[in-house]
Amino acid sequence: MAEAEKTVRTLTGRVVSDKMDKTITVLIERRVKHPIYGKYVKRSTKLHAHDEANQCKIGDKVSIRETRPLAKTKSWALVEVLERAVEV
Protein backbone atom coordinates (compact mmCIF):
# COMPACT_ATOMS: atom_id res chain seq x y z
CA MET A 1 0.00 0.00 0.00
CA ALA A 2 1.52 3.28 -1.11
CA GLU A 3 1.56 6.14 1.33
CA ALA A 4 -0.67 9.04 0.39
CA GLU A 5 1.12 12.37 0.30
CA LYS A 6 -0.29 14.70 2.93
CA THR A 7 -0.86 18.35 2.13
CA VAL A 8 0.64 20.66 4.71
CA ARG A 9 -1.85 23.18 6.09
CA THR A 10 -0.49 26.72 6.18
CA LEU A 11 -2.18 29.84 7.53
CA THR A 12 -1.37 33.54 7.68
CA GLY A 13 -2.10 35.80 10.64
CA ARG A 14 -0.92 38.50 13.05
CA VAL A 15 1.11 37.92 16.22
CA VAL A 16 -0.90 39.11 19.24
CA SER A 17 1.38 37.77 21.99
CA ASP A 18 5.07 36.87 22.26
CA LYS A 19 5.38 36.67 26.05
CA MET A 20 6.03 32.92 26.18
CA ASP A 21 9.45 31.41 25.53
CA LYS A 22 9.66 30.02 21.96
CA THR A 23 5.88 30.37 21.52
CA ILE A 24 3.74 33.00 19.81
CA THR A 25 -0.01 33.50 19.71
CA VAL A 26 -1.29 34.11 16.17
CA LEU A 27 -4.71 35.62 15.39
CA ILE A 28 -6.24 34.16 12.22
CA GLU A 29 -9.13 36.18 10.76
CA ARG A 30 -11.52 34.87 8.12
CA ARG A 31 -14.73 36.11 6.51
CA VAL A 32 -17.77 33.81 6.69
CA LYS A 33 -21.15 34.29 5.06
CA HIS A 34 -24.03 34.29 7.57
CA PRO A 35 -26.28 31.29 6.78
CA ILE A 36 -29.58 33.19 7.02
CA TYR A 37 -28.87 36.85 6.32
CA GLY A 38 -26.07 36.45 3.77
CA LYS A 39 -23.90 39.17 5.31
CA TYR A 40 -20.18 38.47 5.52
CA VAL A 41 -18.94 38.59 9.12
CA LYS A 42 -15.42 38.34 10.54
CA ARG A 43 -14.55 35.28 12.57
CA SER A 44 -11.22 34.80 14.31
CA THR A 45 -9.16 32.01 15.84
CA LYS A 46 -6.12 32.22 18.12
CA LEU A 47 -3.45 29.55 17.64
CA HIS A 48 -0.21 28.91 19.52
CA ALA A 49 2.80 28.42 17.25
CA HIS A 50 6.40 27.37 17.86
CA ASP A 51 8.99 30.14 17.32
CA GLU A 52 12.37 28.46 17.83
CA ALA A 53 14.49 31.62 17.54
CA ASN A 54 12.13 33.98 19.42
CA GLN A 55 12.25 36.26 16.35
CA CYS A 56 8.60 37.41 16.23
CA LYS A 57 7.25 40.54 17.88
CA ILE A 58 3.67 41.71 18.48
CA GLY A 59 2.10 42.98 15.27
CA ASP A 60 4.20 40.91 12.84
CA LYS A 61 2.41 39.23 9.95
CA VAL A 62 3.51 35.57 9.89
CA SER A 63 2.96 32.32 8.04
CA ILE A 64 2.52 29.14 10.13
CA ARG A 65 2.19 25.46 9.25
CA GLU A 66 0.60 22.53 11.05
CA THR A 67 2.98 20.13 12.78
CA ARG A 68 2.93 17.36 15.36
CA PRO A 69 1.72 18.37 18.83
CA LEU A 70 4.55 20.13 20.66
CA ALA A 71 2.57 20.93 23.82
CA LYS A 72 -0.98 20.67 25.11
CA THR A 73 -2.17 23.62 23.00
CA LYS A 74 0.69 24.04 20.50
CA SER A 75 0.61 22.16 17.20
CA TRP A 76 1.68 24.85 14.71
CA ALA A 77 5.16 26.08 13.77
CA LEU A 78 6.43 29.36 12.35
CA VAL A 79 7.38 29.20 8.66
CA GLU A 80 8.40 32.80 8.01
CA VAL A 81 7.81 36.40 9.00
CA LEU A 82 6.01 38.02 6.06
CA GLU A 83 5.94 41.58 7.36
CA ARG A 84 7.52 43.21 10.40
CA ALA A 85 5.48 45.42 12.73
CA VAL A 86 6.12 49.15 12.55
CA GLU A 87 8.33 50.38 15.40
CA VAL A 88 6.87 53.35 17.27
From Swiss-Prot:
One of its GO terms (biological process) is translation. Keywords: Ribonucleoprotein, Ribosomal protein, RNA-binding, rRNA-binding. Signal peptide: none annotated. GO terms for cellular component: cytosolic small ribosomal subunit. Gene3D superfamilies: Nucleic acid-binding proteins. It comes from the Bacteria. GO terms for molecular function: rRNA binding; structural constituent of ribosome. Transmembrane segments: none annotated. Coiled coil: none annotated. Belongs to the universal ribosomal protein uS17 family. NCBIfam families: PRK05610.1, uS17_bact. One of the primary rRNA binding proteins, it binds specifically to the 5'-end of 16S ribosomal RNA. Part of the 30S ribosomal subunit. This is Small ribosomal subunit protein uS17. The lineage of its organism: Bacteria, Pseudomonadati, Pseudomonadota, Gammaproteobacteria, Pseudomonadales.
